[in-house]
Amino acid sequence: MEIAPIPGLSDDVNDIRLRTADIVNAEIIPAEPVLFKGGKEAEPVRAHIRELVKERGLWAPHLPTEYGGMGIGFLAHAYMNEVLAWSPFSARLFGVVAPNSGNQKVLLKYGTEEQKKKWLEPLISGEMESCFSMTEPGNAGSDPRSIQTRAVRDGDEWVINGHKWFTSNARRADFAIVMCRTARETPEAGKPDDTMVQIIVPMDTPGLEIVRSVPVWGHTNGDHCEITYKDVRVPVDNALGRVGSGHQAAQDRLGAGRVFHCMNSIGAMWRAFDMMVRRSMDRDVHGGKLETKQFVQGFIADSYMDIQAARLMTINCARVMDEGGDARTDISAIKVFVPAAFERVVDRAIQVHGALGVSGDTPLAGMYTGARTLRLADGPDEVHRILIAKNVLKHYHSGGSWDFGT
C-alpha cells in the first residue's frame, strides 16, 4: 500500500493516515498468516501490535481523549479507516472493532457514571468483550419496532424473557446490551415507541443460554449466536437511559455503525483493486499478460470508478455528520451503494485471480462474503432505498428541491 499526503487535507489528518499506513504495511499485513491461524502463536503478535498502536496515539479513533481514544471526528476517521481497513485484522488491533465500538458509543451517550466505570472502561481497555443482542428469529430484523423480547420490572430488578439470534461476538462477550420492550403491544405505525429499553446483561446471568452459533456462509464455528433469555434477572440500574430511549439509542448506534462499515469497505475494496491490477500485470495467459486483455482492462476501469464513487460518497457523508447536518439520506445512500460496489470490485478481482481467488490463500473470498453480508447487516438495501426516496419526496412536497451541494 502506497500512501501519499492528500493536498488540501489538514497536516494532522494526513499524519494520522500516514502513521496508520506504516503500521498496517510493516506490522499487520506481514503477520496476517499468523493472525489468521490464531491460537497461542498469534497472541503475542496481537499484543505487540496493540501496544505499538497505543504508543503512536492511534488507539480507538472513535472515542474521546478522556476515555483513551483519539477524539477525531467522522471525516478524519473516514480518511484513517480507508487505510486501516486494508487488513481484516486491523480494526481489533486499533481498538475499533464491532460490536464493541458501537456498544462503547452507546455507553458513552446513555450510560451513567457508574455504568461507564463498570462496563465502558474495561471494554475500552480490552479487559472485557461485549455483544449487541437485538435481532430476533421471529421478527424482521429491519423493523426494530417489532421486537418482542420483554423486560418486566419486579422490585429492583428487570426480568427478561425473549429469543435473539445473530448476536455477534456472543461467545467472547462478558456482557450483552439487550434490546427489550416493557409492554406487550407494539405501538401503531408512525407513533413514538416509548416502551423500548436497552439493558446490560452479564453473559453468566442465570437464564441466559447460548443455544448455538448460527452457520453463516457454510461456517459452523462462527460467533453469530442464537440466545434465549428465560427469566433473566438483572438490577434495574442496568438499564441504559430511560425506558423509551431504546429505539433512539439503537438508531444512534446503527447510524454510526453503517458509516463505519462503509469506511471499512473502502479500504478492503482498495486492497482488492490493488491485488487485481498486480495480478493482471504478472499473469501470463494465451501468449500475453492479463493486463493486455480488454475484458480485464474493463474490470480495472469499472473498479476504479466504483471505488472513487464509493469513497467520495462516504467522505461527503462523514463531512455532513461532522458539521452536524442531517445525514440520514446520505447514510442510507452509502449503505446501499458502498457494499454493492465492494461486492462488484471483489467479484472482478476474484475473476482475475481465477481459482486462486476463491481459495483461502488470498483475502478475496472473505471479502466477498463480507461484502454480500453488508447488504443485509444494519438494514437491507431495500429499506434504505425506500428511506432515500421518502426523504427526497418529503423535501419536494414541502416546496423545496434537492441541493446536492449541501
What residues fall within each predicted segment?
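Glycine-rich phosphate/pyrophosphate-binding beta-alpha loops
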Residues: 140, 165-171, 219, 256-260, ...
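Short Gly/Pro-enriched turn/cap motifs at secondary-structure boundaries
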Residues: 123, 138-142, 166-169, 188-191, ...
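Flexible, glycine-rich active-site loops centered on histidine and acidic residues
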Residues: 104-110, 133, 185
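A short core secondary-structure module
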Residues: 148, 156-157, 161-210
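Flexible, small-/acidic-enriched active-site or ligand-binding loops
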Residues: 146, 204-233
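Short, conserved phosphate-binding/catalytic loop or strand-edge motifs used
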Residues: 97-104
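Alpha-helical interface subdomain recognition
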Residues: 1-90, 97, 110-115, 122-127, ...
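A short, Trp-centered hydrophobic/proline-enriched beta-strand micro-motif
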Residues: 126-135, 179
